Curated annotation (Swiss-Prot):
Primary location recorded for the protein, binned into one broad class: cytoplasm
Modified residues (Phosphoserine): 9
UniProtKB keywords: Acetylation, Actin capping, Actin-binding, Cytoplasm, Cytoskeleton, Phosphoprotein
GO BP annotations, alphabetical order: actin cytoskeleton organization; barbed-end actin filament capping; cell junction assembly; protein-containing complex assembly
Any GO molecular function: cadherin binding
The name this protein goes by in its record: F-actin-capping protein subunit alpha-1
GO cellular component: actin cytoskeleton; cortical cytoskeleton; cytoskeleton; cytosol; extracellular exosome; extracellular region; F-actin capping protein complex; WASH complex
Modified sites of kind N6-acetyllysine: 19, 97
UniProt superkingdom: Eukaryota
Subunit organization: Component of the F-actin capping complex, composed of a heterodimer of an alpha and a beta subunit. Subunit of dynactin, a multiprotein complex part of a tripartite complex with dynein and a adapter, such as BICDL1, BICD2 or HOOK3. The dynactin complex is built around ACTR1A/ACTB filament and consists of an actin-related filament composed of a shoulder domain, a pointed end and a barbed end. Its length is defined by its flexible shoulder domain. The soulder is composed of 2 DCTN1 subunits, 4 DCTN2 and 2 DCTN3.
Length: 286
């Protein structure tokens, strides 16, 4: 370890640590952080040098957070980043301080940031909330209204996760949808992401994403929001169905081809009871 410390600079150590952290599977940030902390063995260096990695991880993962005094959770995303660790909750019209390590919100303050698009944002938010409630058992969403390069833009973010560490798996769904308010038609751009980690007696990850483009008729706020959600629903249903079908095909073909055939005896070896077999006893005596 001494030779390693001599050869690798603190800057390089932090870069490696940050890489591990930003690639932590969903629901396993704390485990990865604690392992990296032990390897680096320098808390001050880790906290100061890798702080950007904590923030990047939470924004990339659309981490949901509950703000005390408010019912709905809000997503931590780059679209709500106000700087200095403050984030926007457009639904509740507040900003708040977010601790990227503890994943806790504090100091809520009034904040108006809909770019004069209040009715558009609220219509899309209301429709998206209903959709997420119907389709995701543990889903959250946040809708932003911003002016980007002179274009009035609606951005919708969806997150849903299932963390089952006792059963050795964790998974997260993320999707992001955008359209500009440019009558009579607008282009809808979406990106869908799935990440699942299974680690019982092995280490398997499913990482998948899909880019989507569609067109949207822009009329009044309510009707446009309805059509926007319909596009989201169709694309996400199609993607999830394709993932399921592809996974089944892989299970029936690719994974099956990797399995070791049964021995001539047509009997599987119970490796947990190997000592009870004759070969096990012979090895033990040897």
């Amino acid at each position: 370890m001494a030779d390693f410390d001599d050869r690798v600079s603190d800057e390089e150590k932090v870069r490696i640590a940050a890489k591990f952290i930003t690639h932590a599977p969903p629901g396993e940030f704390n485990e990865v952080f604690n392992d990296v902390r032990l390897l680096l063995n320098n808390d001050n260096l880790l906290r100061e040098g890798a702080a950007h990695a904590f923030a990047q991880y939470n924004m990339d993962q659309f981490t949901p957070v509950k703000i005390e005094g408010y019912e709905d959770q809000v997503l931590i995303t780059e679209h709500g980043d106000l700087g200095n660790s403050r984030f926007l909750d457009p639904r509740n019209k507040i900003s708040f301080k977010f601790d990227h390590l503890r994943k806790e919100a504090s100091d809520p303050q009034p904040e108006e940031a809909d770019g004069g698009l209040k009715s558009w944002r609220e219509s899309c938010d209301s429709a998206l909330r209903a959709y997420v409630k119907d389709h995701y058992s543990n889903g959250f969403c946040t809708v932003y209204a911003k002016t980007i390069d002179g274009q009035q833009t609606i951005i919708a973010c969806i997150e849903s996760h299932q963390f089952q560490p006792k059963n050795f798996w964790n998974g997260r769904w993320r999707s992001e949808w955008k359209f500009t308010i440019t009558p009579p038609t607008a282009q809808v751009v979406g990106v869908l992401k799935i990440q699942v980690h299974y680690y019982e007696d092995g280490n398997v990850q499913l990482v998948s994403h899909k880019d989507v483009q569609d067109s949207l008729t822009v009329s009044n706020e309510a009707q446009t929001a309805k059509e926007f959600i319909k596009i989201i629903e169709n694309a996400e249903n199609e993607y999830q169905t394709a993932i399921s079908e592809n996974y089944q095909t892989m299970s029936d073909t690719t994974f099956k081809a990797l399995r070791r055939q049964l021995p001539v005896t047509r009997t599987k070896i119970d490796w947990n009871k190997i000592l009870s077999y004759k070969i096990g006893k012979e090895m033990q005596n040897a």
